[in-house]
Amino acid sequence: MIRVLVVDDSLVMRKAISRIFEQADDTTVVDTATNGEAGVEKARRLEPDVVTMDVEMPKMNGIEAVRHIMEASPRPILMLSSLTEKGAEVTMEAMRAGAADFLSKGASSATLRANDVEEKLLGKVRALADSNARLFREDGPSPAETVSSTGSREASSSSSPTSSGTDTATKGSYELAVIGVSTGGPMALQHVIPALPAAFPLPIAIVQHMPAQFTRSLADRLDSLSELAVAEAEDGMLLEPGRVVVAAGDRHLTVERREGALTTCTPAEPAGDSHRPSVNVLFRSAVEACREDVLTLVMTGMGKDGLEGARRIQDDGGTVYVQDEDTSVVYGMPRAVAEAGLADATFPLDDLPDAMQKAAGAPARP
């Protein structure tokens, strides 16, 4: 049974959120808290498997509560926030403080009662209950340090076939790098993109499962940390070395070749994919535009988005790397690709930038 602590200053929201967990077969609410201060104390005392956290609360807001919880008793925290631009900025700050993921709770309890919101809430909590909470904090230990400091994870770096990654780097010359990532992605991407040099010779296209306001905030954050130019994707952007584009949260990101040049497209269709933006949609378009000259990363995230796209990339002779289990916040998307036999190599998070540079023939960052 997954034990959940619900922190929200609204009585109506606390009841609505609690009802969802109590009606599910595998979740239960151990307690509720009306503000961040009480949430910190109850998280320490009750040791829940997952905490759901409001953003704006009296006495102590959600961001401060996240910092205190991650310092005193680290555990997965799911932020429940609004879909406003301000809400996106505050939520991203909470994730930098250590929150694992977020979900829009809308403006009323009626929004929560919508079936898709209930399913998303339960799905995220179930995934986070099995996640590695120590990886969430931006100022916390690096994934490599986390692996080496936990008994059952000590063999991660040596057991991951990093050497096979360098072997597959000669599979072909590359024209484009594509990345698919979900839960835990914002922090994972901050380990990868800023570690690449300005001379990295491939454009990079990223799908991170997030609403629109959040993807812009993520792109701005990565741009501020990186030597590469990072921006939220718009239709018609030229994909050239030194540029990184992040799919907008309400649009797909695809790649087309126009007059010989790789260019972004941001269609709303196909609507049938379970995610928008969809990793599969990006990967399929990359194969169609570049054939075998695609370097692919599948990183931390729940679900299987990217599996079929990775299969297409492999079938056409491209290269697929996956993040390993020990450094993934949620080992869902990488697991699906690895277990299908589609991964050329598996790397700990901190080794991914070096693997990308070796594959692309980029000079090491000084």
Swiss-Prot record:
Residue span, Response regulatory domain: 3-120
CDD domains reported for this sequence: CheB_Rec, REC_CheB-like
Example GO molecular function: protein-glutamine glutaminase activity
Catalytic activity of the protein: [protein]-L-glutamate 5-O-methyl ester + H2O = L-glutamyl-[protein] + methanol + H(+); L-glutaminyl-[protein] + H2O = L-glutamyl-[protein] + NH4(+)
PROSITE patterns found in the cross-reference section: CHEB, RESPONSE_REGULATORY
Active site residues according to the UniProt entry: 182, 209, 305
Annotated GO biological process: chemotaxis
A GO cellular component annotation in the UniProt record: cytoplasm
EC code(s) of this entry: 3.1.1.61, 3.5.1.44
Record has Ligase as a keyword: no
Keywords: Chemotaxis, Cytoplasm, Hydrolase, Phosphoprotein
Bias (Low complexity) ranges: 146-169
Ranges for region Disordered: 134-169
Enzyme class: hydrolase
Family named by the database record: Belongs to the CheB family.
Chain's role: Involved in chemotaxis. Part of a chemotaxis signal transduction system that modulates chemotaxis in response to various stimuli. Catalyzes the demethylation of specific methylglutamate residues introduced into the chemoreceptors (methyl-accepting chemotaxis proteins or MCP) by CheR. Also mediates the irreversible deamidation of specific glutamine residues to glutamic acid.
Protein name in UniProt: Protein-glutamate methylesterase/protein-glutamine glutaminase
Species for this entry: Salinibacter ruber (strain DSM 13855 / M31)
